[in-house]
Curated annotation (Swiss-Prot):
This is Ribonuclease HII. Keywords: Cytoplasm, Endonuclease, Hydrolase, Manganese, Metal-binding, Nuclease. Residues 32-223 form the RNase H type-2 domain. It comes from the Bacteria.
Length: 231
């Protein structure tokens, strides 16, 4: 239980943690394996959207699984390794900025999740997707869970894998395009990123030129210290 910031000392905020209840019920219904799916990178101005699909081992679930946005960088990195070492199957997929521009971010996110699921080494009987939409074309039954990364441990694991992989990809972009600071803001619309775009222009095939800032000439700036709360 976490204390909420308030003028009243008696006000508390209960922070719900994801559990394995959705997966356990599916197992009881004969729907196993169950995969969790999530993506990272819907909001940035640059870089890919990355998705992951994870089938956890019910007998070996890493402690501390949570929505990746509620974890620190170091917590995500540690859990990433534990997930890879304990899960029954893990798969990742990405859609490039060009692919996003060629459709839209929602379609690209759903397609990345579908590709990640198809890439699993086991064939799940049920896929749990974070959000409101089930990706079309899944090879199994699918269920969308709003705030699923805060409700299902399988989805939480997928959110961590997707976030860590995307951050690593953006750090690689930063080493190739050192004037933009991708390794700091991960492609989000921070003041530093906006200034770099205004000074040097967008990077071909890396910036999402279909996004409003490039079409309309402006966007809300995201402060770099707030990036921990973004996917």
């Amino acid at each position: 239980m976490a204390r909420a910031r308030s003028d009243s000392p008696l006000l508390f905020e209960i922070v719900e943690k994801p559990d394995f209840s959705f997966e356990t019920k599916a197992m009881a219904d004969g729907l196993w394996p169950v995969a969790g799916m999530d993506e990272a990178g819907r909001g940035p101005l640059a870089g890919p959207v990355v998705a992951a699909a994870v089938v956890l081992d019910p007998a070996n679930i890493p402690e501390g699984l949570d929505d990746s946005k509620r974890l620190s960088h170091f917590q995500r990195e540690a859990l990433f390794l534990r997930i890879l070492g304990s899960a029954q199957a893990v798969s990742m997929a990405s859609i490039s900025a060009e692919g996003i521009d060629g459709s839209n971010i929602l379609k690209a996110s759903l397609e990345a999740m579908r590709r990640a699921l198809v890439g699993l080494s086991v064939r799940p009987k049920l896929a749990l997707a974070d959000g409101r939409d089930v990706p079309p074309g899944l090879p199994c039954d699918g269920r969308a869970l709003i705030k699923g990364d805060q409700r299902s441990q399988s989805i939480a694991a997928a959110s961590i894998v997707a976030k860590v992989m995307r951050d690593r990809m953006m750090c690689g972009c930063g080493s190739h395009h050192d004037r933009y600071g991708f390794e700091v803001h991960m492609g989000y619309a921070t003041a530093r990123h906006r200034t770099a775009i205004e000074t040097h222009g967008p990077v071909a095939r890396l910036h999402r030129v279909s996004f409003a800032p490039f079409r309309l000439g402006g966007t809300e700036v995201v402060e770099e210290e707030s990036l921990a709360g973004l996917d």
